[in-house]
Regions:
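Membrane-proximal intracellular helices of multi-pass ion channels
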Residues: 1-445
Length: 445
């Protein structure tokens, strides 16, 4: 008994996060396998249930079965629950229920919560968790109410479920939709390309969910006083704005030329917002230009911001790497932004995360292309979508073999738990040594 207790204590917060996500995924897969989870009342193959559960918990949106037509109301409810748990984070949800039960949160649990939401300090973590959960449900409720008239107008009373499902899916950056039918599978939001209400509501939910819980806290605390924001919040907001506006302008001039002006603007903005880990689409993705698809791959790899419902290598990672490059060009020792120096460890972490994501994306694409005999560009789009936990696809996901599906499952999982979380969980502190090897310079560039 004492040995088991000792082992539990040895589990770091990073290992708890990694194992927590894995546990929820497996449990979700087992439930989705049950006959009453599907409309046909059949047992779903384990690899398909596992793929769907992983995609939901990792808030990705890639599917091998159409969510609207294949899964029953029970199955859809389970998927939505998995999305909500995955969006908030397994640790955050567990901590919230512990608080509801009146249990005292230990220091170790607070430390795990801190790592789970990328908080700068342990102090105030319980208050922040309450703020996150309440804010999440409030924003999702607002999104549901805004979309309610449109969906109820199209689907009657069923529109209430439609509005709730798509509001949660959008806020959690999941990209799952239940609009498909047996005759029209995998439609996403293509039927609403010109609907201003749905487009704006979904984009708002995606952006708010993707900027990070700490950024919300900063905005709510300091209101519109931008100068009072933390440096990280400033970097996140500016980077997010640039990653929306620049691609949208490019898409406007290179794609959607056959649409009326209003729809063209909406489509350009929507396809600029959604690749950053949301996965909805209003446009015909295969019909977009090759250069636009390449830009979308980059957006998918970047993803959202730390401590958010989004995946990807994060906006701050991109910003730190660019700022570091600027500091080299200006012959400065440290990267600087907003009147502050960026810690050198942040630059090293950003480089490690970026290399990890690009390797997963590239190697995964090559393996799938080889296994399936598909064009490499199409497979790279798929793996970028998986490791960035986006959910956009050029239509190949349902046709992939079991090996390729397993590769995507691994990529989705690694993309959601986060690069540094995985690295810290895998490497023991025992490997760290105070001794340093002799220094020698190496030429780069």
């Amino acid at each position: 008994m004492s040995e088991i207790t000792h082992r539990k204590k040895r589990l770091s917060s990073f290992k708890l996060i990694v194992l927590g996500f894995a546990g929820v995924i497996v449990l979700g897969a087992l439930i989705l396998m049950l006959p009453f989870s599907s409309t046909a009342g059949v047992v779903t193959p384990f690899h398909e249930a596992l793929f769907t559960s992983t995609s939901a918990v990792c808030v990705t949106g890639l599917v091998v079965q159409d969510t609207g037509s294949y899964w029953s109301a029970f199955g859809q409810a389970i998927i939505l629950l998995l999305i909500q748990i995955g969006g908030l984070g397994v640790v955050t949800v567990a901590a919230f229920f512990a608080m509801l039960s009146g249990r005292k949160i230990s220091l170790m649990q607070r430390s795990t919560m801190q790592d789970a939401i990328s908080a700068p300090k342990v102090g105030g973590i319980v208050r922040l968790t309450r703020f996150i959960v309440r804010g999440t449900f409030l924003i999702e409720l607002i999104g549901m109410i805004v979309m309610l008239p449109t969906f109820c107008g199209n689907y009657g009373i069923k529109g209430i479920w439609m509005a709730a499902f798509h509001s949660i899916s959008a806020f959690c950056n999941a990209g799952f939709d239940i609009l498909g039918t047996a005759e029209n599978k995998y439609p996403s939001l293509t039927g609403y390309i010109g609907d201003t209400t749905i487009n704006i509501a979904v984009m708002f939910l995606i952006i708010v969910g993707g900027i990070g819980f700490l950024t919300w806290d900063d905005i709510c605390t300091n209101k519109w006083h931008f100068k009072k924001y933390r440096m990280q919040s400033k970097v996140i907001l500016v980077t997010t704005m640039l990653l929306i506006i620049a691609p949208a302008v490019f898409f406007f001039f290179c794609d959607f030329t056959g649409l009326p002006l209003g729809e063209r603007i909406l489509a350009s903005l929507f396809q600029s917002v959604t690749p950053r880990t949301a996965g909805f689409n209003t446009a015909d993705l295969p019909a977009m230009t090759g250069s636009s698809k390449a830009i979308m791959i980059l957006l998918m790899l970047v993803g959202g911001s730390p401590g958010s419902t989004a995946g990807g290598m994060k906006t701050t990672t991109l910003a730190v790497l660019i700022l570091s490059a600027f500091s080299v060009c200006r012959k400065k020792d440290d990267a600087e932004v907003c009147g502050r120096r960026i810690d050198g460890s942040a630059v090293k972490n950003a480089a490690a995360v970026a290399v990890m994501y690009f390797l997963l994306f590239f190697v995964g694409g090559i393996v799938i292309s080889t296994a399936e005999g598909l064009p490499l560009s199409t497979c790279l789009y798929e793996t970028a979508s998986a490791v960035g936990t986006v959910g956009l696809t050029l239509g190949i996901t349902p046709q992939l073999g079991v090996l390729s599906q397993l590769i995507l499952i691994v990529l989705m999982y690694l993309g959601r738990v986060g690069g540094l979380t995985l690295i810290y969980a895998a490497i023991s502190n025992k490997n760290q040594s105070g001794a340093k090897l002799p220094l020698e310079k190496i030429t780069v560039g």
